[in-house]
Amino acid sequence: MIGRLRGSLAEKQPPHLVLDVNGVGYELEVPMTTLYRLPHVGETVTLHTHLVVREDAHLLYGFYEKRERELFRELIRLNGVGPKLALALMSGLEVDELVRCVQAQDTSALTRIPGVGKKTAERLLVELKDRFKAWESLPGTFTLVSNGPNQAEPVASAESDAVSALISLGYKPQEASKAVSAIKEKDLSSADLIRRALKGMG
């Protein structure tokens, strides 16, 4: 099991990235909450990882905080929740927001996530309630702030990456394109475009 990787961020194409560890490139898929915190390409970063082994592939998922990885592991233990839906949930809600949502048994926040209807949201909240009791006493919160100005990206490339990332989360291509196009601010990175688009669709 690969539990943690430290290396140079070689590529960043949401929601995927490549981490160069001593000359070996590890391809990882990350939630948007991790993407927002990543440094510039070429800089060093440490990610906590979870490996999913399938017959046809070995899939590696990366998380900026260990607590995010633990949440991911809790989510994929639930009936009907695979890595894709778990990443979508974590991309649409911060960890502490999801914990508060479970505490309050609030279905409205979950149903904004692609692929989560009312019945699914109700079932997830019931199943997560007991699992999250231990989380209430854990210190620390997640504040989604970037480590600094994002490296400049060509506008067309940033918008294309943002749309692709939203589609990978389960949004329809038209929804994703419309949400990104609706953002009026100029010269934003793909991470900032994704963040604003998700807020706009929430």
Curated annotation (Swiss-Prot):
Coiled coil: none annotated. Keywords: Cytoplasm, DNA damage, DNA recombination, DNA repair, DNA-binding. Residues 1-64 are annotated as: Domain I. The keyword DNA repair applies. Its main location: cytoplasm. It comes from the Bacteria. Residues 144-153 are annotated as: Flexible linker. Residues 65-143 are annotated as: Domain II. Gene3D superfamilies: 5' to 3' exonuclease, C-terminal subdomain (1.10.150.20), DNA helicase RuvA subunit, C-terminal domain (1.10.8.10), Nucleic acid-binding proteins (2.40.50.140). GO terms for biological process: DNA recombination; DNA repair. GO terms for molecular function: ATP binding; four-way junction DNA binding; four-way junction helicase activity. It is found in: Cytoplasm. One of its GO terms (cellular component) is Holliday junction helicase complex. Residues 154-202 are annotated as: Domain III. Belongs to the RuvA family. The RuvA-RuvB-RuvC complex processes Holliday junction (HJ) DNA during genetic recombination and DNA repair, while the RuvA-RuvB complex plays an important role in the rescue of blocked DNA replication forks via replication fork reversal (RFR). RuvA specifically binds to HJ cruciform DNA, conferring on it an open structure. The RuvB hexamer acts as an ATP-dependent pump, pulling dsDNA into and through the RuvAB complex. HJ branch migration allows RuvC to scan DNA until it finds its consensus sequence, where it cleaves and resolves the cruciform DNA. Has three domains with a flexible linker between the domains II and III and assumes an 'L' shape. Domain III is highly mobile and contacts RuvB. Homotetramer. Forms an RuvA(8)-RuvB(12)-Holliday junction (HJ) complex. HJ DNA is sandwiched between 2 RuvA tetramers; dsDNA enters through RuvA and exits via RuvB. An RuvB hexamer assembles on each DNA strand where it exits the tetramer. Each RuvB hexamer is contacted by two RuvA subunits (via domain III) on 2 adjacent RuvB subunits; this complex drives branch migration. In the full resolvosome a probable DNA-RuvA(4)-RuvB(12)-RuvC(2) complex forms which resolves the HJ. This is Holliday junction branch migration complex subunit RuvA. It comes from Pseudomonas savastanoi pv. phaseolicola (strain 1448A / Race 6) (Pseudomonas syringae pv. phaseolicola (strain 1448A / Race 6)). The lineage of its organism: Bacteria, Pseudomonadati, Pseudomonadota, Gammaproteobacteria, Pseudomonadales.
